[in-house]
């Protein structure tokens, strides 16, 4: 059943060449990953209702099959604290090419990491860990491994990051939960193994 629902999402996504964020959130939720509270809408009244359920401040992101990098079109707005700003954001995002909705999510504090994957034709599923955010393509601070992974593999990936000191609490920043990060990497590798034939 789980695979059937995920397979349907991935089949739908082939037309764009990537999975839209709400669909990715759905896959992660189905697979037991903890995700931020979120909702998707095209209507102002519903956006306000969702934001109140989630609790301000919220993040708003464009959902569009025509937009791969949301930040390139100013399609991500963080720290929205009130209904008026939320509605203005919806109005602006709705004018961007291919607008299919606005994702509203809870603000999550902390360091941004990227965990990604590619199904290599020779090696099968490859898992990537790196420093996230808009600088991911500039800094190229990443580590790669073939799936499936064990926790020791995840630990080696973390140790290979140049900016790994940020993860352990650099200066006044809080350290991240390394155990949770390793488990997330391992579980993500299992997801990639399960989906490699889809």
Model-derived segments and spans:
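ATP-dependent carboxylate/acyl-activation modules
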Residues: 1-198
């Amino acid at each position: 059943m789980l695979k059937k629902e995920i397979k349907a999402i991935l089949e739908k996504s082939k037309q764009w060449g990537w999975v839209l964020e709400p669909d990715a959130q759905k896959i992660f939720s189905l697979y037991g990953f903890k995700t931020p509270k979120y909702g998707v809408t095209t209507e102002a009244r519903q956006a306000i209702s969702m934001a109140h359920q989630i609790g301000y401040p919220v993040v708003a992101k464009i959902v569009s099959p025509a937009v791969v990098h949301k930040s390139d079109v100013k399609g991500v707005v963080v720290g929205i604290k009130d209904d008026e700003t939320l509605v203005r954001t919806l109005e602006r995002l709705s004018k961007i090419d291919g607008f299919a909705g606005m994702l509203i999510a809870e603000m999550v504090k902390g360091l941004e990491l990227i965990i990604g994957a590619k199904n290599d034709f020779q090696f099968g599923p490859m898992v990537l860990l790196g420093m996230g955010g808009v600088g991911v393509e500039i800094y190229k601070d990443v580590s790669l491994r073939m799936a499936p992974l064990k926790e020791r593999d995840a630990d080696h990936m973390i140790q290979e990051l140049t900016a790994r000191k940020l993860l352990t609490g650099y200066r006044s920043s809080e350290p991240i939960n390394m155990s949770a990060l390793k488990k997330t990497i391992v579980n993500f590798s299992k997801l990639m193994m399960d989906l490699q034939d889809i």
